């Protein structure tokens, strides 16, 4: 009795060919620039805020709204930077950005950063473009 099993390499190649195009060619390309934080008087400025939002593939207003709620302050988006009322350490800002990435960027099913936020009726979902999973998220 002879069974014709697929060779592992052939199965792996077949699986690779069926991956979406945006997933195939990335290695560990998800790199978020560190926040360039400066404190001027009673204001904290994140100089590269727009660059961070672009790296996360998120609307800067959404990221700003999250950040303002997390640190309980007021702030404005001015061009490529954000001005926050109050003095906040770079460590605090970095931790809040990590929390945002965990909750609103990284797919909880497969761990891919290739996600987008979609709205269906009154609910918001994190839709993964790599595995197709849709995970409900808290609306800001």
From Swiss-Prot:
GO molecular function: translation initiation factor activity
Keywords: Initiation factor, Protein biosynthesis
SMART domains referenced in this protein's UniProt entry, alphabetically: eIF2B_5
Matching SUPFAM superfamilies: Translation initiation factor 2 beta, aIF2beta, N-terminal domain, Zinc-binding domain of translation initiation factor 2 beta
Entry keyword Protein biosynthesis: yes
Domain of life (superkingdom): Archaea
Protein biosynthesis among keywords: yes
Pfam families assigned: eIF-5_eIF-2B
SS bond list: none
Subunit description: Heterotrimer composed of an alpha, a beta and a gamma chain.
Biological function: eIF-2 functions in the early steps of protein synthesis by forming a ternary complex with GTP and initiator tRNA.
UniProt xrefs under HAMAP family: eIF_2_beta
Family designation: Belongs to the eIF-2-beta/eIF-5 family.
This protein's name: Translation initiation factor 2 subunit beta
Organism in which the protein naturally occurs: Pyrococcus furiosus (strain ATCC 43587 / DSM 3638 / JCM 8422 / Vc1)
Gene designation per UniProt: eif2b
